[in-house]
Amino acid sequence: MKQSKLLIPTLREMPSDAQVISHALMVRAGYVRQVSAGIYAYLPLANRTIEKFKTIMREEFEKIGAVEMLAPALLTADLWRESGRYETYGEDLYKLKNRDNSDFILGPTHEETFTTLVRNAVKSYKQLPLNLYQIQSKYRDEKRPRNGLLRTREFIMKDGYSFHHNYEDLDVTYEDYRQAYEAIFTRAGLDFKGIIGDGGAMGGKDSQEFMAITPARTDLDRWVVLDKSIASMDDIPKEVLEEIKAELAAWMISGEDTIAYSTKSSYAANLEMATNEYKPSSKVAAEDALAEVETPHCKTIDEVAAFLSVDETQTIKTLLFVADNEPVVALLVGNDHINTVKLKNYLAADFLEPASEEEARAFFGAGFGSLGPVNLAQGSRIVADRKVQNLTNAVAGANKDGFHVTGVNPGRDFQAEYVDIREVKEGEMSPDGHGVLQFARGIEVGHIFKLGTRYSDSMGATILDENGRTVPIVMGCYGIGVSRILSAVIEQHARLFVNKTPKGDYRYAWGINFPKELAPFDVHLITVNVKDQVAQDLTAKLEADLMAKGYDVLTDDRNERVGSKFSDSDLIGLPIRVTVGKKAAEGIVEIKIKATGDSIEVNAENLIETLEILTKEH
């Protein structure tokens, strides 16, 4: 492919509105352009990368018997009313009317559509299982689109749906998809973890997220690629190294979620779902009597603890939530933080929000800072974190402004439902007892759910089972964020390329180091002087030879300065660069491996053979 024929609008500078390196490089390297807020055009390079990823997906899904189809993006609102999500999905749902004033939506996901199609076509367990998927654009009216392709209003997604006559059959397909996803993301060159996830708006129970890890850019050996003009990091002056470190640190780590993972086992979970090893403790101290103490001007846990000279771990944090219009009291050990996802899931609530100060005062008789679990109205629902039951003689609010109660003992002074509702902390023991929890940032690239009968129940999707009984179809759901894969790969494979000029100056610039499977082309073939006919002829021969061996070749045939060509090549990020330069008449070309910065000169006749050796090594 001739570069002069492609739309690759590279920029000299990083875009000023970009906060994450993937967004900056996609724009600067000419992969994407924003059309309006949260809406992007995928230019030829991005489209080629996305198509390569689609090919990987299709190959892996064929292995597990998944069949591709295409559903409409424009959906009738009636289907979403059937499932109940038209009202509950929230403001992210694009709603519109046609000329007949009928309600429609732009699909953010397609559970209802696929359920309806199968409901109307499948009547017997003998017609199951079915394993269907599609790849198409989705729409969500994001309040604040940001970070390039990571949070957009239109995005490309692969969503799959499986249909079964029982849960045992679903379990088999779920495991097939889990393995297929691992194969897909491995082939795509991603550093990822499969983690325990939350079903969220999908309505699933068991689920697993696949997170592309976005580590801090502190490891120079990983993030910096040295040109052949620099032997090692030790040769770079200290002041230049400090500049390089500052440039690496200047770009925000783009991971949208925090994950907790074990240092010694396979345990990993989204922070919203992560738990830790818990061991109930026996009470050894005698229980004190309750005593009300004045705590003037103490509104926070740390202020109360300091005033009473107790540790924060001996205090009870009392919170009030409204769950589906019903008040729920939540209790935590004072230095812990509430995990609202865990609480919402435990309550099986559709809506959960913190109560207002007015609501708290009406319920407790006091304002924030003085709330506690003692002497609440009969029938009050109290959900306490499991650590609370280990407390003896704790401090809690007295439900009287400016006062607290000491000597509070769970079981004696209040009754509660005990469950894990806290956020885990880094360094705590993994729940499986192996290793401690560490945190990392990550980008969600895939998610699989066991939906069960959530949609078949609400939409009447039933079959006759082997005993002739009418039963709901059991479903699974499997998504991959196709367009955000591009962002995730660039976040992990962006590199700072450093070289030394003939005058001894050090220069560095960002570029992409695409893994071979997703690079838009395999080889960047550059002619230094397009007016040199010998070089032109050699370039044409090499292009034909490479293509005959199955290489995708981008040939830079532009009449541009060589420095501009090399800068664009570093930005675009193809794995191999072959330069036809001053030694073209001698039949000598230069090969450069992008990942390492290594370069060698070879006879053009030996190019293919040399590339085969080099690509095996790297």
UniProtKB/Swiss-Prot annotation:
One of its GO terms (cellular component) is cytosol. GO terms for biological process: prolyl-tRNA aminoacylation. CDD domains: ProRS-INS, ProRS_anticodon_short. Keywords: Aminoacyl-tRNA synthetase, ATP-binding, Cytoplasm, Ligase, Nucleotide-binding, Protein biosynthesis. It comes from the Bacteria. Its EC number is 6.1.1.15. Its main location: cytoplasm. One of its GO terms (molecular function) is ATP binding. Belongs to the class-II aminoacyl-tRNA synthetase family. ProS type 1 subfamily. Catalyzes the attachment of proline to tRNA(Pro) in a two-step reaction: proline is first activated by ATP to form Pro-AMP and then transferred to the acceptor end of tRNA(Pro). As ProRS can inadvertently accommodate and process non-cognate amino acids such as alanine and cysteine, to avoid such errors it has two additional distinct editing activities against alanine. One activity is designated as 'pretransfer' editing and involves the tRNA(Pro)-independent hydrolysis of activated Ala-AMP. This is Proline--tRNA ligase. It comes from Streptococcus pyogenes serotype M3 (strain ATCC BAA-595 / MGAS315). The gene is proS.
